[in-house]
């Protein structure tokens, strides 16, 4: 994102946090694409429970209202609100907790090298995750060492 898009993403993040405070939802990411008049603002929220379509519609309406009232986006724009989906990387502890029991592909740093492992996520707290590898070995990885983690699809 360029500086203008990053500034806009930061403003949208703040407004989204205001809308979802006190709910079970949390903000995962905001991405801004395009230029004045053709902007697309993508907001990703998640929950440790199922993300409901009715909730998404209501939250989207509230975010859109605040964006318009505060004149955050210069010109017309398209607001897209969704859950991150299975293909997006996991970035927050709550996302890991939600996916305990699933198989993950995790890229992490170890002694200055980058390694990749595939294993079943058996635990996740606010500091680290635990994977059970195919060898039955259990591996604890602090979030600070993880550079990317994705759900490994079974097909």
From Swiss-Prot:
GO terms for biological process: ribosomal small subunit assembly; translation. Keywords: Cytoplasm, Ribosome biogenesis. It is found in: Cytoplasm. The keyword Cytoplasm applies. CDD domains: YlxS_C (cd01734). One of its GO terms (cellular component) is cytosol. Its main location: cytoplasm. InterPro entries: Ribosome_maturation_RimP, RimP_C, RimP_C_sf, RimP_N, RimP_N_sf. The keyword Cell division does not apply. Belongs to the RimP family. Required for maturation of 30S ribosomal subunits. PANTHER family: RIBOSOME MATURATION FACTOR RIMP. This is Ribosome maturation factor RimP. It comes from Salinibacter ruber (strain DSM 13855 / M31). The lineage of its organism: Bacteria, Pseudomonadati, Rhodothermota, Rhodothermia, Rhodothermales. The gene is rimP.
């Amino acid at each position: 994102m360029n500086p203008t898009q990053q500034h806009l993403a930061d403003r949208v993040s703040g407004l989204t946090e205001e809308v979802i405070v006190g709910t079970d939802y949390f903000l995962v990411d905001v991405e801004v694409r395009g230029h004045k008049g053709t902007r697309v603002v993508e907001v990703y929220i998640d929950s440790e429970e199922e993300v409901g379509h009715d909730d998404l519609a209501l939250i989207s309406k509230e975010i859109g209202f605040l964006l318009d009232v505060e004149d955050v986006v210069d010109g017309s724009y398209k607001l897209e609100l969704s859950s991150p989906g299975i293909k997006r990387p996991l970035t927050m502890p709550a996302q890991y907790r939600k996916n305990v029991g699933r198989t993950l592909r995790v890229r992490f740093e170890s002694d200055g090298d980058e390694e990749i492992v595939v294993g079943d996520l058996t635990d996740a707290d606010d500091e680290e995750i635990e994977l059970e590898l195919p060898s039955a070995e259990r591996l604890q990885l602090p979030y600070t060492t993880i550079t990317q983690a994705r759900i490994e699809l079974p097909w």
